[in-house]
């Protein structure tokens, strides 16, 4: 209805219209959280790291990957976490046995350099480097999983997990996942003693890594509900 040129109505029709408007507003209010949640990125894969610090078990980190939003980046991480490509063939390299070489408290923990271990190495499953896929997802807070790089289109295998919101990294680093379980382990890693270059004094290693099944929910009609995380 054009409010600048109101349409003549009877009292009864006005009451009916008011009721409809009130009902519409109420429905929108009730459904709005669900709509926002439904727009969250779909988690297509779950992978885990079993972490050791100084040779002693520290705990497990479970991460969800956004394979619908950034399929190429998510598959790179999944393959490196499992050591197998999408066909189940061994890569001959990957994250297992590698270390977290850079820890900065109130910022992030960084790993993924399985060739040199100092932040200068690593490689992707697509070759040495691959381009930035997109910057649709943002660094919204603790637990965000994002690609480390040396500038535009230089993604390899190195990644970081945020321990705080890092909005200044938006549109510069590709977000591709989120920690689902084990943030206590991440915070424990964040607080270890470090030396020059933010390197842990005692090594933090990925003792084991792999993929976990996703348990999908089912709606009232028996349809599988996508596994999402609300950002």
Swiss-Prot record:
Q: Where is this motif: Prevents secretion from ER?
A: 228-231
Superkingdom of this protein's organism: Eukaryota
Here the disulfide bonds are: none
EC numbers, comma separated: 5.2.1.8
Q: Which residues form a coiled coil?
A: none
Q: What class of enzyme is it?
A: isomerase
Q: Which reaction does it catalyse?
A: [protein]-peptidylproline (omega=180) = [protein]-peptidylproline (omega=0)
Where in the cell does this protein reside?
A: Endoplasmic reticulum lumen
Span of the secretion signal? Answer: 1-35
Q: What is this protein called?
A: Peptidyl-prolyl cis-trans isomerase B
Q: Which organism does this sequence originate in?
A: Cryptococcus neoformans var. neoformans serotype D (strain B-3501A)
Encoding gene, per UniProt annotation: CPR2
List the carbohydrate attachment sites: 155
Q: Which family does it belong to?
A: Belongs to the cyclophilin-type PPIase family. PPIase B subfamily.
């Amino acid at each position: 209805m054009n409010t600048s040129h109101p349409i003549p109505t009877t009292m009864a029709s006005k009451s009916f219209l008011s009721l409809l408007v009130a009902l519409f507003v109420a429905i929108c209010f009730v459904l709005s959280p669900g709509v926002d949640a439904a727009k969250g990125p779909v988690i297509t894969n779950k992978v885990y790291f079993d972490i050791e610090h100084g040779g002693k078990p520290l705990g497990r980190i479970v991460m969800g990957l956004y394979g619908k939003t950034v399929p190429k980046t998510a598959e790179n991480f999944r393959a490196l976490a499992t050591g197998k490509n999408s066909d189940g063939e061994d890569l001959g390299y990957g994250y297992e046995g590698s270390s977290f070489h850079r820890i900065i408290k109130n910022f992030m923990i960084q790993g993924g350099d399985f060739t040199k271990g100092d932040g200068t190495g690593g490689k992707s499953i697509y070759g040495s480097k691959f381009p930035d896929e997109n910057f649709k997802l943002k660094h919204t807070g603790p637990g965000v999983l994002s690609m480390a790089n040396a500038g535009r289109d230089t993604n390899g295998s190195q990644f970081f997990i945020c321990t705080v919101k890092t909005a200044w990294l938006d549109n510069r680093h590709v977000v591709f996942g989120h920690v689902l379980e084990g943030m206590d382990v991440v915070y424990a890693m964040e607080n270890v003693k470090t030396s020059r270059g933010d390197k842990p004094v005692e090594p933090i290693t990925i003792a084991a890594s792999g993929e976990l099944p996703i348990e999908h929910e089912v709606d009232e009609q028996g349809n599988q509900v996508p596994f999402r995380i609300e950002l």
